Curated annotation (Swiss-Prot):
Annotated family: Belongs to the universal ribosomal protein uS7 family.
Quaternary structure and partners: Part of the 30S ribosomal subunit.
Subcellular localization: Plastid, Chloroplast
Any GO BP annotation: translation
Higher taxonomy: Eukaryota, Viridiplantae, Streptophyta, Embryophyta, Tracheophyta
Organism whose genome encodes this protein: Dioscorea elephantipes (Elephant's foot yam)
Protein name, per record: Small ribosomal subunit protein uS7cz/uS7cy
Example of a GO MF term: rRNA binding
Stated role: One of the primary rRNA binding proteins, it binds directly to 16S rRNA where it nucleates assembly of the head domain of the 30S subunit.
Keywords: Chloroplast, Plastid, Ribonucleoprotein, Ribosomal protein, RNA-binding, rRNA-binding
Amino acid sequence: MSRRGTAEEKTAKSDPIYRNRLVNMLVNRILKHGKKSLAYQIIYRTVKKIQQKTETNPLSVLRQAIRGVTPDIAVKARRVGGSTHQVPIEIGSTQGKALAIRWLLGASRKRPGRNMAFKLSSELVDAAKGSGDAIRKKEETHRMAEANRAFAHFR
């Protein structure tokens, strides 16, 4: 039996302006080379652009987009015998949000456009409406899990 204790789960901090944990999670994922102030600038510009586009509360659009992209189930490669199977596993809420944010940022980076704030705001608005690359990625993951449902007992 291991002598090591289990690590305490860290709670996500809130960002200074909106006091929102999701915004802070986004900032930490968009961060590159330790330039956190630039990451904050990009996110705050994104929020302003969402406000201009939708004329509703931008944080509710962000919440709705992340809720729409968050997967319930995913597949994990598991080696059984000589072959590797894609085994469907359930995903917790924290891990699901992290995946959703990663997918949203990946989809927005692939988009054509002027700058990251513009691309991310477009992707978030699309995801809130139920379209976009991030939503497609979620649906594809769910399809994969459904197709490999027969291997669920390998968990």
